[in-house]
Design a protein with these regions (language model features):
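Short functional hotspots at interaction and active-site rims
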Residues: 1-227
Length: 227
């Protein structure tokens, strides 16, 4: 028993130490295994900073785009449990809602959801329709997924640029540059609650409701968050 108390005391001391230096106990995020070319990374970061500067001055719009999904079994959140309390998310047949979303630092959001596997033609159609409703030159930041680099998108880029829509591709393996990653983390970790995973209907309704409320009732201070 004495040994057990000693181990517990050590854990408390470790926790106290980390809290005292400003550390937080949180989920460890995954990073891609690859490493981008230093030269390409430096060049892209410099160009991104230029776009950020123009956007902050109101000269352009800069959206950060990405795909993600919500799934009845893929994500199980943390939660506090009292001793003897059985907190759980019921297991059920896996259901998945795929999301393509774009957000800027002023919480302007555009996107769509689908139960289908994210097809390139849906992304293309969305961007094409989006290009008809621009108030100023608009840049959409994307990663290098094949769905963003397909032949049809390449063919339409000159037409989109005539309308004022420009695509900017991140360097490979650089999700930390995309604030849409912050959006997805907050969506799954805060706006979707543990009880929302009870059924797929509740989960997908909550997801769509949260996405529709971005910039209105739900906002992110991106200066306090990193992707």
């Amino acid at each position: 028993m004495g040994a057990s108390l000693g181990q517990r005391g050590k854990r408390l001391n470790i926790q106290t130490f980390f809290i005292s230096i400003g550390a937080r106990y949180k989920r460890i995020r995954k990073r891609p295994r690859g490493v981008p070319s230093p030269q390409l990374y430096e060049y892209k970061v410099e160009k991104l900073q230029e776009l950020e500067s123009k956007a902050s001055e109101g000269r352009i719009r800069l959206y950060y785009a990405d795909e993600i999904h919500t799934c009845t079994e893929e994500y199980v959140p943390y939660g506090w449990q009292l001793q003897g309390e059985d907190v759980y998310v019921p297991s059920q047949r896996v259901a998945r809602l795929n999301i393509f979303g774009m957000i800027d630092r002023d919480n302007r959001y555009n996107g769509f959801t689908t139960f289908e596997k994210m097809p390139a033609d849906k992304v293309l159609s969305f961007l094409d329709e989006f290009s008809f409703n621009l108030e100023m030159d608009t840049f959409v930041l994307l990663d290098n997924a094949s769905v963003h680099r397909n032949k049809k998108i390449k063919e339409l880029r000159p037409l989109w640029e005539q309308r004022g829509l420009f695509l900017f591709f991140l360097p490979p393996y650089s999700p930390q540059l995309n604030i849409a990653e912050t959006l997805w983390r907050i969506l799954k970790g805060k706006w979707i609650r543990p009880q929302d995973y009870i059924t797929s209907d509740i989960l997908f309704y909550t997801t769509n409701r949260a996405l529709a409320d971005i910039g209105k009732g739900l906002r992110i201070n991106f200066s306090k968050h990193v992707a």
